[in-house]
């Protein structure tokens, strides 16, 4: 260390240490302020969550609220206007049975609407890229070539060949009986249908509750309709039909609502009873996947061959756990599900993003060189000690532009003879160009040399002295290069 330089070095070292040591001390406080996010907040499907992710529904919930209003209003009118009269005239068991049916209907409805129907998690970017490469190899195409459309796998279930289709949105091969819901934008295991009346998909995890809901609602609708008619008949026997309607106007509204809804509800319950007894889904029945019209060899491989067994499996079997941890916390290194690309390979997309990043780094590196060259090169010392000057390392330059090979510089139009120049000739020129910015020896750019990132660089303490015409021409060329780069 040269004498007298201890003070500046200490200041430099102190400022450098204080700059780097302050950032780690601030990071823990910043992390404490940021609350941990749960997975339901970044769920890729079109769903709505309530109660911190405990309740999961579809976004289209308008018809669900209509279902709630119809059930609550009809049942409330029945308990308020019909049950008091029927409990006195017939039996107190009528309001008790109606209450049990009502609570059972509401419980199964909410259980169906608020639960996970069996959503399958989407593939992560790494899983999707690996699967895309497997498909490319299986189809005999390279990553940049055209891939033929068939994306299916075939599995054998109880002697029946079942095709597994590839989902371009979830980036997975759907398991048997699974399908993608276009409204919720999720692949649902054992997908039955999307029911707007319950505001959710009906799948493997909530099908039994859906069936119990429509079955109990059928009993409740028939029960209310029957005893509303009984109430009107008993009153009409005492005071006449018109007076009976005037005494209990709510009974008319209940009878109309029940009359128009009982047929569809009872019919839907009967249809799903048939599906359960044959171990089918609504989706399979509509598509005719296991229809007898396709031949005797086309049979349902999921049926146990016994109606009682099929019903027990559908209604009394164990409920599979949810495959999406919607209330779990997001880890910093947890990969997010892959975004849909409509058939474009993730490998190609990742490669193109890497190429764009490399191009941006190269452009930034070239900008640094041109910005340094744009400043006129003037130095008060008229001595020349080296033919090669080294460019100081830039901390922002990274791979793949870590090594820069600079082309040979364009010789100026006129080069002054340094042997004949004197200090008296140089100083007036310096005074004439006070508007220019002068470079220190450490900031001067170097002539051509392969510079490796991270290697120690030796800096020359002497510079070439250029003439006025050379400085102006170099300045103009550098400005043109910067203008061209800014348009990239």
Swiss-Prot record:
Transmembrane segments: 61-81, 90-110, 209-229, 256-276
Protein's UniProt keywords contain Cell cycle: no
PROSITE patterns attached to this UniProt entry: DHHC
Record-annotated DHHC domain positions: 165-215
Annotated catalytic residues: 195
EC number annotated for this UniProt entry: 2.3.1.225
Membrane topology: Multi-pass membrane protein
Cytoplasmic membrane side: 1-60, 111-208, 277-488
Lumenal side: 82-89, 230-255
Localization terms from the record: Endoplasmic reticulum membrane; Golgi apparatus, Golgi stack membrane
Record keywords, A-Z: Acyltransferase, Endoplasmic reticulum, Golgi apparatus, Lipoprotein, Membrane, Palmitate, Phosphoprotein, Transferase, Transmembrane, Transmembrane helix
Tissue expression per record: Widely expressed.
Catalytic function, reaction form: L-cysteinyl-[protein] + hexadecanoyl-CoA = S-hexadecanoyl-L-cysteinyl-[protein] + CoA
CC per GO annotation: endoplasmic reticulum; endoplasmic reticulum membrane; Golgi apparatus; Golgi cisterna membrane
Domain notes for this protein: The DHHC domain is required for palmitoyltransferase activity.
Protein task: Palmitoyltransferase that could catalyze the addition of palmitate onto various protein substrates. May have a palmitoyltransferase activity toward the beta-2 adrenergic receptor/ADRB2 and thereby regulate G protein-coupled receptor signaling. May play a role in cell differentiation and apoptosis.
Protein name, per record: Palmitoyltransferase ZDHHC14
Organism this protein belongs to: Homo sapiens
């Amino acid at each position: 260390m040269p004498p007298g330089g201890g003070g500046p070095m200490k200041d430099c070292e102190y400022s450098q240490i204080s700059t780097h040591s302050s950032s780690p001390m601030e990071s823990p406080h910043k992390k404490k302020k940021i609350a941990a996010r749960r997975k339901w907040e970044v769920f890729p499907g079109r769903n709505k969550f309530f109660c911190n992710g405990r309740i999961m529904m579809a976004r289209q919930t308008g018809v669900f609220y209509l279902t709630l209003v119809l059930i609550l209003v009809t049942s409330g009118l029945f308990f308020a206007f019909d049950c008091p009269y029927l409990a006195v005239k017939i039996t107190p068991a009528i309001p008790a049975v109606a209450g049990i049916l009502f609570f059972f209907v509401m419980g199964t409805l909410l259980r169906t609407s608020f639960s996970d129907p069996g959503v399958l998690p989407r593939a992560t970017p790494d899983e999707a890229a690996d699967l895309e490469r497997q498909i490319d190899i299986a189809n005999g195409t390279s990553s940049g070539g055209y891939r033929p459309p068939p994306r299916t796998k075939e599995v054998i279930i109880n002697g029946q060949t079942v095709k597994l289709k590839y989902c371009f949105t979830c980036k997975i091969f759907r398991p048997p009986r699974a399908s993608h819901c276009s409204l919720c934008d999720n692949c649902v295991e054992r997908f039955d249908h999307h029911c707007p009346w319950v505001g959710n998909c009906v799948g493997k995890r909530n099908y039994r509750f859906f069936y119990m809901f429509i079955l109990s609602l059928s009993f409740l609708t028939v029960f209310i309709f029957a005893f509303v008619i009984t109430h009107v008949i008993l009153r009409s026997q005492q005071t006449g039909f018109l007076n009976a309607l005037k005494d209990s106007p709510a009974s008319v509204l209940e009878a109309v609502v029940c009359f128009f809804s009982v047929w569809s509800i009872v019919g839907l319950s009967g249809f799903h009873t048939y599906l359960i007894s044959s171990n089918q889904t609504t989706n399979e029945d509509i598509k005719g996947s296991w229809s007898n019209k396709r031949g005797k060899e086309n049979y349902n491989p999921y049926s146990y061959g016994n109606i009682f067994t099929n019903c027990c499996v559908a209604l009394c079997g164990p409920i599979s756990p949810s495959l999406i941890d919607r209330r779990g916390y997001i880890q910093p290194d947890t990969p997010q599900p892959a975004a849909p690309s409509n058939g474009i390979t993730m490998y190609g997309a990742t490669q193109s993003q890497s190429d764009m990043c490399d191009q941006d780094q190269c452009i930034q590196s070239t900008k640094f060189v041109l910005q340094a060259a744009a400043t006129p090169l003037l130095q008060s010392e008229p001595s020349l000690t080296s033919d090669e000057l080294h460019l100081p390392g830039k901390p922002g330059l990274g791979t793949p532009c870590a090594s820069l090979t600079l082309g040979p510089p364009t010789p100026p139009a006129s080069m002054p003879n340094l042997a004949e120049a004197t200090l008296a000739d140089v100083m007036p020129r310096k005074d004439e160009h006070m508007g220019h910015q002068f470079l220190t020896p450490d900031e001067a750019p170097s002539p051509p040399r392969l510079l490796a990132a991270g290697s120690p660089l030796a800096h020359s303490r002497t510079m070439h002295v250029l003439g006025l015409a050379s400085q102006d021409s170099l300045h103009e060329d550098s400005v043109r290069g910067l203008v061209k780069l800014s348009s990239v």
